[in-house]
C-alpha cells in the first residue's frame, strides 16, 4: 500500500465512523426525538415542501446543536441563517438593528431562491420579531415549524450561565426567559400539503368546477348561484370561487387564535400533538363538493389522524351527531365575501342530510366518479378512487390577512392573496 493511499484512508475512515456514531447516537437521545430528524417518511416528505425551521430558546439551551443536525439531515437544498454569524448578542434587538437588517436580507434572498429547508438559529423570544418572520414565510409561501430544545437545562438559568458562549449573566438570562416559558400557539394547527400534492388536488378541483359548470343538470340550478332576474345560461365556477388559497393547501385541525380560543392550550399540550408536530401524514380525499358559498375536498381520517382531531368539531346545527372527523376538509375556494370556515360547515350540512336518508340524486358520471345533486345548489363528486395526498402536521402562525405573495426565482411580486 502506498503511503499516500494510507494517509487518505486514515483521514477518510474516521469521518465515516463519526457520521455513523452521530446518527445512531441521535436516535437514543430523548432531547433529539423530533419527527423531522428521526422519521424517514417525514424527511422524504419535507424534501417536497418549502419549510422554515425557526429555532427558539435561551442561549446555551441546545438550539445550535439542533440547527446543525437539521442541516446535516437535509444537506442539499438546505441553508442555515444563524444570529451568531452576524455577531448578534441575545437581548434587545434595538442594539443590533443593522445586523438584523442584514440577516433578514440574507434570509429573504434564500426564500427567493426557493431553498427547500431554511433553518433560522436565534433566541426568537419576542413576539414582534416572530411576527416579522411569519409574514416573510407568508410572502414566500413557506410553512413554519417552530423548534425548541428538549434539553433538561433549557430553562435553568443557573446552568445556562455556565453553558452560553456569550457569557451572559444570570440577570441577562432571566430577562429573556419569560418570552420562552410558554408554548407559542399558532392561529391554527393542521396538515399542510406538499407542493406537489397541493398542485394535484388544486388541479383536480379546477377540473371538477369546469365539468360541473358545463353539466346540463347544474345549468338548470343556476338560480342558487346567480342573484337577480337576469337569465344566464352558464357560470364560470373557477372565477366564481375566486377566493383561493395562494400557497399550499391545508386541512385544519384546531383553531387556536394564538392561544385565545377555547381549548387551544389543552389541545397543544396533548402528548399526541407534541409528538406529531412536524411529522408527515398521508391524507385520503374521498369526495369533492360545491355549494353556493364554498368548494372543498372531503378528507377521510384514519385512526392515527383522528387522534389529532378535536372532539368538538363535528357538531352540525341540528342535534344529531356525526362521527369524529366528519368535518375534515380542504378548502379549495370561496365565493366573494365568504370566510373559509364556512367550508367545513357546508360539509357537515351535506353529511347530516345524507345521514338523514337523503342521499341526493345521482345525475351523471364524471371521469373521476359519480356526481350527486343534493338540492339548494349543493353538489358532490364521490371519487371512484380516493386521492392520497402527503402533508406535514404543523401550525399556521401568520395573521391570515392579505400579503404580497412574491414570485420565487423570477423575483417579482405576483399578487396579493389572503391565506385561508
Swiss-Prot record:
Modified residues (Cysteine methyl ester): 417
Top EC class of this enzyme: hydrolase
Residues bearing the modification Phosphotyrosine: 110
Record lipid sites (S-farnesyl cysteine): 417
Coiled coil feature spans: none
Record's bilayer topology term: Lipid-anchor
Stated consequence of mutating residue 250 to L: Reduces activity 15000-fold
GO CC term (a single one): perinuclear region of cytoplasm
Positions bound to substrate: 252, 331
Keywords assigned by UniProt, alphabetized: Hydrolase, Lipoprotein, Membrane, Methylation, Phosphoprotein, Prenylation, RNA-binding
Modified residues (Phosphothreonine): 262
Record note on quaternary structure: Exists as monomers and homodimers.
Described function: Catalyzes the formation of 2'-nucleotide products from 2',3'-cyclic substrates. May participate in RNA metabolism in the myelinating cell, CNP is the third most abundant protein in central nervous system myelin.
Name this protein carries in UniProt: 2',3'-cyclic-nucleotide 3'-phosphodiesterase
The species this protein was found in: Rattus norvegicus (Rat)
Gene name as annotated: Cnp
Amino acid at each position: 500500500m502506498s503511503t499516500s493511499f494510507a494517509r487518505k484512508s486514515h483521514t477518510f475512515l474516521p469521518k465515516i465512523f463519526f457520521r455513523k456514531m452521530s446518527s445512531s447516537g441521535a436516535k437514543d437521545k430523548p432531547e433529539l426525538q423530533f419527527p423531522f430528524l428521526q422519521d424517514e417518511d417525514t424527511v422524504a416528505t419535507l424534501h417536497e415542501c418549502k419549510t422554515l425551521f425557526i429555532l427558539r430558546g435561551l442561549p446555551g439551551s441546545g438550539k445550535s446543536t439542533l440547527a446543525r443536525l437539521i442541516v446535516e439531515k437535509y444537506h442539499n437544498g438546505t441553508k442555515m441563517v444563524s444570529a451568531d454569524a452576524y455577531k448578534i448578542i441575545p437581548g434587545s434587538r434595538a442594539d443590533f438593528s443593522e445586523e438584523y437588517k442584514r440577516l433578514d436580507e440574507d434570509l429573504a434572498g434564500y426564500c427567493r431562491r426557493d431553498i427547500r429547508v431554511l433553518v433560522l438559529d436565534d433566541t426568537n423570544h419576542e413576539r414582534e420579531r416572530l411576527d416579522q418572520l411569519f409574514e416573510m414565510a407568508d410572502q414566500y409561501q413557506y410553512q413554519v415549524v417552530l423548534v425548541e430544545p428538549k434539553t433538561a437545562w433549557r430553562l435553568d438559568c443557573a446552568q445556562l450561565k455556565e453553558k452560553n458562549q456569550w457569557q451572559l449573566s444570570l440577570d441577562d438570562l432571566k430577562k429573556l426567559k419569560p418570552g420562552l416559558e410558554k408554548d407559542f400557539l399558532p392561529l391554527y394547527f393542521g396538515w399542510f400539503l406538499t407542493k406537489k400534492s397541493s398542485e394535484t388536488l388544486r388541479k383536480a378541483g379546477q377540473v371538477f368546477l369546469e365539468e360541473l359548470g358545463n353539466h346540463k343538470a347544474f345549468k338548470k340550478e343556476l338560480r342558487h348561484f346567480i342573484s337577480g332576474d337576469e337569465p344566464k345560461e352558464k357560470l364560470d365556477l373557477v372565477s366564481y370561487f375566486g377566493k383561493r388559497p395562494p400557497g399550499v393547501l391545508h386541512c385544519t385541525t384546531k383553531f387556536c387564535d394564538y392561544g385565545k380560543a377555547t381549548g387551544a392550550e389543552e389541545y397543544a399540550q396533548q402528548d399526541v400533538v407534541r409528538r406529531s408536530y412536524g411529522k408527515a401524514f398521508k391524507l385520503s380525499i374521498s369526495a369533492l363538493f360545491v355549494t353556493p358559498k364554498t368548494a372543498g375536498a372531503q378528507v377521510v381520517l384514519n385512526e392515527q389522524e383522528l387522534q389529532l382531531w378535536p372532539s368538538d368539531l363535528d357538531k352540525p346545527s341540528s342535534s344529531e351527531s356525526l362521527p369524529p372527523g366528519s368535518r375534515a376538509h380542504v378548502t379549495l375556494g370561496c365565493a366573494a365575501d365568504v370566510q373559509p370556515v364556512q367550508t367545513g360547515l357546508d360539509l357537515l350540512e351535506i353529511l347530516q342530510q345524507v345521514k338523514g336518508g337523503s342521499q341526493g340524486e345521482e345525475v351523471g358520471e364524471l371521469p373521476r366518479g359519480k356526481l350527486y345533486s343534493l338540492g339548494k345548489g349543493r353538489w358532490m363528486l364521490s371519487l371512484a378512487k380516493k386521492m392520497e395526498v402527503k402533508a406535514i402536521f404543523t401550525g399556521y402562525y401568520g395573521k391570515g390577512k392579505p400579503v404580497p405573495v412574491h414570485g420565487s426565482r423570477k423575483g417579482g411580486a405576483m399578487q396579493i392573496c389572503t391565506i385561508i
